[in-house]
A protein has these predicted regions:
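A general, composition-driven signal for non-globular sequence regions
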Residues: 17-18, 49, 60, 84
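Sec-dependent N-terminal signal peptides of Gram-positive bacterial secreted proteins and lipoproteins
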Residues: 1-28
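Long, charged/polar, soluble alpha-helical segments
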Residues: 69-76, 80-81, 85-91
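Generic preference for well-ordered secondary structure
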Residues: 5, 9, 28-31, 35, ...
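C-terminal amphipathic alpha-helix
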Residues: 29-76, 119-174
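Short, solvent-exposed, charged loop/turn and helix-capping segments
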Residues: 83-114, 168-174
Length: 174
C-alpha cells in the first residue's frame, strides 16, 4: 500500500513539474517568397488569370480510344484553340519582359508565369501526339491509360497546376 502511494506521488510530481521544466515553443511565422515593386503587376496578374481560365477549359478535352476521324479532328481543333490562347499569353509575357527589362521583379515573376504556360502547352502537344497515334490506329495508343502516351500529358498538366498553386498560395506579391 505504501509502495502504491509512493508511485502515485511520484507520478503526480512528474505530471505537475514537466510544464515548468520545458519552455513552450510557438509556431514560427511562415516565410513566403516576396515579389516586390512589380511595375507591371496588373498585366502579370491578368496573364495569371488567363492561364487559370484556359486551364479550366482544358478539362473539357475528352479523348477516348473509340473516337472516329471526325471526333479526332474536332478534339484537335479544341486543342489548337487552347494552344493559340496559351501562345498569346506567352507572347504577352515576352513583350512584358522587353518593356520591363530593368525590373528584376517583373522578369522573375513573368518567368514563373511562363513556366505554367509552357507546361500546359507541352501537355496539349502530348495530347495532339496521342490523337495522331489514334488516327493511325496505333494499338498502344488505343490502350490510353495503360499506354505511354498519357503519362507525359498528366505530368506536364500537373506540373503547371502545381506551379500555379505555388504562386497563388505562397507568393507574397507586393
Amino acid at each position: 500500500m505504501h509502495m502504491k502511494k509512493s508511485l502515485i506521488i511520484i507520478a503526480l510530481s512528474i505530471i505537475f513539474t514537466i510544464p515548468f521544466i520545458y519552455q513552450p515553443t510557438y509556431a514560427q511565422e511562415k516565410y513566403y517568397p516576396k515579389v516586390e515593386n512589380l511595375q507591371g503587376k496588373e498585366q502579370l496578374m491578368a496573364e495569371l488569370d488567363e492561364l487559370k481560365r484556359v486551364r479550366e477549359n482544358m478539362s473539357t478535352i475528352n479523348i477516348t480510344s473509340d473516337l472516329d476521324s471526325e471526333g479526332l479532328k474536332r478534339t484537335n481543333q479544341y486543342i489548337a484553340t487552347y494552344l493559340t490562347e496559351l501562345n498569346s499569353v506567352r507572347s504577352d509575357l515576352e513583350t512584358h519582359r522587353v518593356n520591363y527589362k530593368n525590373s528584376f521583379a517583373d522578369l522573375y515573376f513573368s518567368e514563373q508565369i511562363q513556366f505554367i504556360a509552357d507546361s500546359y502547352i507541352i501537355s496539349l502537344r502530348q495530347q495532339q501526339n496521342l490523337l495522331s497515334q489514334l488516327d493511325k490506329n496505333n494499338p498502344d495508343a488505343k490502350k490510353l491509360f495503360e499506354s505511354d502516351y498519357l503519362t507525359p500529358t498528366y505530368y506536364y498538366v500537373t506540373l503547371g497546376d502545381q506551379m500555379y498553386s505555388y504562386i497563388v498560395d505562397y507568393f507574397s506579391i507586393l
